[in-house]
Each structure stands twice: as structure tokens, then as C-alpha cells.
């Protein structure tokens, strides 16, 4: 396998996502042959990237729009370059219109949404281009998520986080509280069995690597792995999390007492996985590398 040259952009992405210094990030990327995700895993295994949650840092602006029908809800992310434009009435009107068009036409593909008739003889894409020219910022329709169900609760936290949750039983207030909880705690799944196998395997690998570094006997290491996985599932599964309305109780216990079953949910947060441009970063990295090579 040929060696990948570590670029300033790659170093910046790893630095933004871990909070580590430039030289540490450069070294980690060299060891992972330029693979950012592998570098993050390796840093977590070694204990350098202790703030694991920083791996999901937000680095873009825009808005999440919720369009809701009788038995279906659409979440749409529309991006811009600054929070100033995200609050602009022209941007907001465009984003709301596009979300409602997607719902009305039941279109779940971003490319297909771009071709929908927007009005005034324009398609959505043509309206987007016109808005870019008017506002002076790049604007993109990034992604759409759809949730179906007889009972759907929705919650939007500011402009940046949108949640829809499908459930059976309970009241509308319970549904709204659930959506608020998901916005705040960001679970990846409803229950343990819903966590993706690859995600669980990746986390187990990281936990095991750190446990074995302790030098303890295998039977103790196994218990450390079990404990680590249990803690991980308590953090990422909805039913195991402490309830946002009463953190003395677990979500699962509250729902059981109220006769509520969660069928599914969708959560979008503006800019997940997108990095902002930092104009002088390449020069900063180059200067640091030059010093390191002296």
C-alpha cells in the first residue's frame, strides 16, 4: 500500500474533531496512512483523545426544518456559511418551502427534491441558485430524513436540531417530552438490540485495547470490557438514558409506567460531519512542520 501524504486539511479535520495539537494529529494521521477515522480510533485507544464526544463536533451553519403530515414527518437540513444567513428571512422562507414541497410530493432524495417545481416557473434548484446570488453565500440542500407513524411528535431546538419520534400509547405531552429528550441526549438507537453491529464492534475494540493496556489478568480485562460496553449502551440507547424530565429515572422505566412504546425516531443536527474552512490553517501547519523538522 502506497503511503498517503498527510495534508493540512486532514490535520485540521482531526484537530477539530479531537481537540489535540497539530503535531499530535499529524503523527496520528501518518500512523493511520491518512485515514481520519482510524486515527481517531487509535487516539482513543491510547487515551490521547479522552473527549470522545468531540468526534462529532459541528462545523457548519444552516437550519433543520420539520414538515409534518398526518402520518409522516420530514426533516430537512439546508446549509449556509454563517449563522447570520441562517436567521435571514429569505433563507428561512426557502428552507420551509422546500421541506413542505418534499412532504407534499413524498420525495426523499435530495437530487429529486432539486427538480421539484418551486413556483414562479422555477425549480427548487433554480430558486436555490437565485437565493445564492441574492444573499451572497453558498446554500445547499444537504439531506432529508423521513419518519412514518400514526403518532409522531416533533421538536426543534433553535434552528440547529430537529427531532421526530413515532410512538404508541401515552399522551401528546409524553411524545413532545420524548422528542425533547432525544434532542438533548442524542441516542443512536432505541434499545440495545437496535445498535448497529459495526458500531458496537468498533466500540468494543476500543474498550478492549484500553483495558489490555492496564496489564491486568484476562478475567479482569473481560470484566472491564463488559463494564465498558454496559456504560456505552447506557449512554447511547434511548431506553437506558436518564430521562431529561427527571434524571433520577431511566427513559425505559418512565415509558413502561405510562404504557408507551417508541417505534422509531430521527434526529438531525446542522453540520454533522462538515468542517468549516479556516483560511490560514495550511500556512499554520506548514510553519509548525518546518519547526518540527529543524
Swiss-Prot record:
Question: What molecular functions are annotated in GO for this chain?
Answer: translation elongation factor activity
Could you tell me where this protein is found in the cell? Cytoplasm
Please give the GO cellular component terms listed in this UniProt entry: cytoplasm
Q: What is its main location?
A: cytoplasm
List each coiled-coil range.
Answer: none
Q: Which Gene3D superfamilies does this UniProt record tie to the protein?
A: 1.10.286.20, DNA helicase RuvA subunit, C-terminal domain, Elongation factor Ts, dimerisation domain
Signal peptide (from-to): none
Classification via Pfam families: EF_TS
**Could you confirm whether the keyword Transcription regulation appears in this record?**
no
Keywords assigned by UniProt, alphabetized:
Cytoplasm, Elongation factor, Protein biosynthesis
Annotated spans, Involved in Mg(2+) ion dislocation from EF-Tu:
82-85
Q: InterPro entries of this UniProt entry?
A: EF-Ts_dimer_sf, Transl_elong_EFTs/EF1B, Transl_elong_EFTs/EF1B_dimer, Transl_elong_Ts_CS, UBA-like_sf
PANTHER family, alphabetized: ELONGATION FACTOR TS (PTHR11741), ELONGATION FACTOR TS, MITOCHONDRIAL (PTHR11741:SF0)
What does this chain do? Associates with the EF-Tu.GDP complex and induces the exchange of GDP to GTP. It remains bound to the aminoacyl-tRNA.EF-Tu.GTP complex up to the GTP hydrolysis stage on the ribosome.
Give the family per the record.
Answer: Belongs to the EF-Ts family.
- Its protein name is Elongation factor Ts
* Species this chain originates from: Psychrobacter cryohalolentis (strain ATCC BAA-1226 / DSM 17306 / VKM B-2378 / K5)
Amino acid at each position: 500500500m502506497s503511503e498517503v501524504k498527510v495534508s493540512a486539511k486532514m490535520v485540521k479535520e482531526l484537530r477539530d474533531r479531537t481537540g489535540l495539537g497539530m503535531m499530535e494529529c499529524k503523527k496520528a494521521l501518518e500512523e493511520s496512512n491518512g485515514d481520519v477515522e482510524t486515527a481517531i480510533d487509535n487516539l482513543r485507544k491510547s487515551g490521547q483523545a479522552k473527549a470522545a464526544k468531540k468526534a462529532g463536533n459541528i462545523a457548519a451553519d444552516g437550519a433543520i426544518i420539520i414538515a409534518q403530515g398526518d402520518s409522516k414527518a420530514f426533516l430537512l437540513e439546508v446549509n449556509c456559511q454563517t449563522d447570520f444567513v441562517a436567521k435571514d428571512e429569505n433563507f428561512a422562507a426557502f428552507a420551509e418551502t422546500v421541506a413542505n414541497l418534499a412532504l407534499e410530493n413524498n420525495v426523499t432524495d435530495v437530487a429529486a427534491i432539486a427538480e421539484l417545481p418551486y413556483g414562479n416557473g422555477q425549480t427548487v434548484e433554480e430558486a436555490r441558485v437565485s437565493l445564492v446570488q441574492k444573499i451572497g453565500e453558498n446554500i445547499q440542500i444537504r439531506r432529508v430524513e423521513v419518519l412514518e407513524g400514526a403518532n409522531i411528535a416533533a421538536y426543534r431546538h433553535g434552528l440547529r436540531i430537529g427531532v421526530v419520534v413515532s410512538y404508541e400509547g401515552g399522551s401528546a405531552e409524553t411524545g413532545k417530552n420524548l422528542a425533547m429528550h432525544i434532542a438533548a441526549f442524542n441516542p443512536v438507537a432505541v434499545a440495545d438490540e437496535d445498535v448497529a453491529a459495526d458500531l458496537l464492534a468498533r466500540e468494543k475494540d476500543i474498550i478492549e485495547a484500553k483495558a489490555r493496556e492496564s496489564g491486568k489478568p484476562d478475567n479482569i480485562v473481560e470484566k472491564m470490557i463488559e463494564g465498558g460496553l454496559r456504560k456505552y449502551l447506557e449512554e447511547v440507547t434511548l431506553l437506558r438514558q436518564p430521562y431529561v424530565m427527571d434524571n433520577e429515572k431511566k427513559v425505559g422505566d418512565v415509558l413502561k409506567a405510562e404504557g408507551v412504546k417508541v417505534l422509531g425516531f430521527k434526529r438531525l443536527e446542522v453540520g454533522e460531519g462538515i468542517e468549516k474552512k479556516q483560511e490560514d490553517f495550511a500556512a499554520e501547519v506548514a510553519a509548525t512542520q518546518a519547526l518540527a523538522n529543524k
